[in-house]
Amino acid sequence: MNTEPTWMAEVVFDENGLIPAIAQDAETGQILMVAWMNREALAETAATGRAVYWSRSRQRLWRKGEESGHAQDVHELRLDCDGDVILLKVHQNGGIACHTGRASCFYRRLEGTASQAEWITIDPVLKDPELIYK
C-alpha cells in the first residue's frame, strides 16, 4: 500500500531521486540557499513546516538548523512549471542561512569585464562559523 501523499506524484525527481530546492526569505524575497530534497525530505518538510533537505555529501537527511540552530520555518512550498524545482518561502531563524556565517549563500558578485571579471565578496560574515559549528 502506497502511503505517499497524492501531491507528490506531480514532483519530478532526477535519476538520483533528488530535486533542487531553493530557500527564499518569505518577507524580503532574498534567495538564501539552494539544496537538494528527496521524497522523504520533501514529505517531512510539508508535514512539519520545518525545512529538511538531503545532504549529498553525508548521504542522509539534513534538518536545517540541527547543528547551527539556524532552522528554517516554511511558510509556503511552491513547485515550478516543469515540476522539477521546489521553492521554499521561509523564515530563517537566526538570520544566517549559509555555513560561512552569512545571511545568504549568494554573497559573491561577478564584477568587471568578461576577460577581467572576478568574484567579489559583497556580504559580511554575521557570525564566525567556528562559533556556529562547535
Swiss-Prot record:
Cofactor, free-text remark: Binds 1 Mg(2+) ion per subunit. Binds 1 zinc ion per subunit.
Gene Ontology biological process terms in this record: L-histidine biosynthetic process
Residues noted as binding Mg(2+) in the record, renumbered to the chain: 80, 82, 84
Domain of life: Bacteria
Assembly and interaction partners: Homodimer.
Family assignment from sequence similarity: Belongs to the PRA-CH family.
Gene Ontology cellular component terms for the protein in this record: cytoplasm
One Pfam entry name: PRA-CH
Annotated gene: hisI
InterPro entries noted in UniProt: PRA-CH, PRib_AMP_CycHydrolase_dom, PRib_AMP_CycHydrolase_sf
Keywords associated with the record: Amino-acid biosynthesis, Cytoplasm, Histidine biosynthesis, Hydrolase, Magnesium, Metal-binding, Zinc
Record field: catalytic activity: 1-(5-phospho-beta-D-ribosyl)-5'-AMP + H2O = 1-(5-phospho-beta-D-ribosyl)-5-[(5-phospho-beta-D-ribosylamino)methylideneamino]imidazole-4-carboxamide
Gene Ontology molecular function: any one: zinc ion binding
Subcellular location: Cytoplasm
Necessary cofactors: Mg(2+); Zn(2+)
Function (record text): Catalyzes the hydrolysis of the adenine ring of phosphoribosyl-AMP.
Repeat listed as a keyword: no
Pathway noted in the entry: Amino-acid biosynthesis; L-histidine biosynthesis; L-histidine from 5-phospho-alpha-D-ribose 1-diphosphate: step 3/9
E.C. number: 3.5.4.19
Enzyme class at the top of the EC tree: hydrolase
Binding site for Zn(2+): 81, 98, 105
Protein name listed in UniProt: Phosphoribosyl-AMP cyclohydrolase
